[in-house]
């Protein structure tokens, strides 16, 4: 199948990938094109920026979480609905899950999906040296680097260097000058949330217009359309009998949700009912709850003041309604949560004790997980992959699942049989038996109400 596509990658983080990706997305949307966007790796925040531009939820592509056929499916089923797909890389182009491998890197994804790559080379404080960087990346190993955009470069320098890049076999596709008033600010958990960037839409609009002036958008589209055909098929997954209604927390406090997780729940028999623990007075009529990650610590007062919602969720869990809670959602289930200002807030109370800010990164990175025994929600011991990134710690991290990463094994997650709650974010397509096991519990709860 013909799926026009290209990847924006860079030698390192901080090169301007997200800024330029958002600008290109805006320019393509302004041309009236139907655009799909993707982010390599497990990051939630960059796709949220993409979504503000394209008006639809952006997706993740992670070669650590899934095998190649599944990766191709997750890409293809969205890309086929659009005229062009834009993939933003992660970290440095060749940086993988360990220091000396390219597994799960942007490079790995580009190879598995046959994507032409445009390298963003940050030229701040350099001129000719940027070509040495470009040549090094081009020659490091066989790759799909087909074009280059120079960031923080003047037109005068670009005009001098572009012919040299072309002689290397890399198409020069333009430059981005220094744009002090169009910077997307950073903070402790990556980029700020889209809703917190003042006048973001105006910024992105102006950014798209600037890139139309200095970047060869037509050349990028030509490159995207030259990508080879990509075949894919949907992986087989199980399905429960009938349908269960799943309440999905979805607001400014609980906004870290993989759209592919939601799609898989639907394939397995879920009807998704989105609700807001901040704004809605009551939990909707559902058979199960998914409390996503996010930033509950930024909304502690609002969450605490919504007593009817807190009571509804506590009572539902106590009655046996199945619940999966990850990171921020796990924090919300505690008796008490320290907010960003150090104020201790009363929360749901389904998890004993408190969660507090340690002032440092507690855990970070990919993790492989499985139940410690067969007595929990899954009724077996399926292996599932996920990732962790949190500054808050808990008095009740749980010991019901085993986690492993880089040769280290530790216990985590509270698994009561109907409640699965802990800091790790799970990626369902890494093992569809996990969401299916959750929905089976939800179906049992549904039937118990009849």
Residue ranges and their predicted role:
Residues 115, 170, 318-322:
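A short helix->loop->beta-strand "cap" motif at the edges of active sites that frequently abuts
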Residues 244-318:
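Phosphate-binding active sites in nucleotide-utilizing proteins
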Residues 296-373:
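Cysteine-nucleophile active-site neighborhood
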Residues 5, 33-36, 243-245, 271, ...:
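Residues that mark the start of a beta-strand
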Residues 127-238:
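Internal gly/pro-rich beta-alpha loop/helix module
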Residues 213, 240-242, 254-264, 271, ...:
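C-terminal and late-domain segments of enzyme folds
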């Amino acid at each position: 199948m013909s799926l026009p596509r290209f990847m924006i990658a860079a030698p390192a983080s901080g090169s301007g990938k997200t800024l330029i990706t958002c600008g290109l997305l805006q320019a393509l949307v302004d041309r009236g094109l139907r655009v799909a966007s993707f982010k390599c790796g497990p990051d939630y925040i960059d796709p949220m920026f993409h979504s503000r531009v394209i008006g639809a939820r952006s997706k993740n592509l992670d070669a650590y979480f899934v095998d190649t056929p599944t990766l191709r499916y997750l890409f293809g089923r969205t890309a086929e609905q659009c005229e062009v797909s834009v993939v933003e890389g992660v970290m440095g182009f060749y940086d993988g899950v360990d220091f000396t491998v390219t597994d799960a890197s942007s490079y790995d994804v580009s190879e598995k999906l046959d994507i032409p790559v445009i390298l963003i080379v940050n030229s701040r404080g350099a001129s000719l040296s940027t070509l040495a960087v470009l040549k090094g990346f081009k020659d490091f190993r066989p790759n799909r680097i087909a074009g280059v955009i120079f960031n923080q470069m003047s037109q005068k320098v670009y005009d001098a260097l572009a012919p040299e890049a072309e002689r290397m076999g890399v198409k020069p596709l333009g430059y981005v000058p220094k744009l002090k008033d169009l910077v997307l600010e950073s903070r402790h958990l990556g980029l700020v949330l889209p809703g917190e960037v003042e006048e973001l839409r105006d910024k992105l609009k102006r950014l798209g217009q600037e890139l139309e002036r200095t970047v060869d958008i037509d050349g990028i589209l030509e490159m995207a359309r030259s990508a080879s055909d990509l075949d894919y098929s949907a992986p087989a997954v199980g399905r429960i009998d009938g349908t269960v209604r799943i309440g999905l927390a979805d607001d400014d406090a609980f906004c870290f949700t993989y759209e592919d997780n939601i799609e898989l729940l639907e394939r397995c028999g879920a009807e998704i009912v989105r609700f807001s623990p901040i704004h809605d007075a009551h939990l909707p009529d559902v058979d199960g709850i998914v409390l996503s990650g996010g930033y509950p610590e930024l909304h502690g007062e609002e969450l605490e003041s919504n007593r009817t919602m807190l009571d509804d969720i506590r009572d539902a869990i106590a009655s046996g309604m199945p619940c999966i809670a990850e990171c921020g959602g796990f924090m919300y289930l505690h008796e008490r949560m320290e907010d960003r200002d150090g104020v201790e807030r009363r929360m749901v109370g389904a998890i004993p004790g408190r969660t507090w800010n340690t002032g440092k990164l507690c855990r970070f990175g990919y993790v492989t997980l499985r139940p410690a025994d067969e007595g929990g929600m899954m009724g077996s011991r399926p292996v599932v992959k996920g990732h962790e990134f949190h500054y808050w710690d808990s008095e009740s991290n749980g010991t019901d699942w085993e986690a492993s990463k880089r040769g280290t094994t530790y216990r985590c997650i509270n698994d009561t049989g109907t409640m699965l709650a802990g800091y790790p974010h799970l990626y369902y397509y890494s093992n569809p038996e996990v969401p299916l096991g959750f929905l089976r519990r939800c179906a049992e709860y549904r039937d118990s109400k009849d």
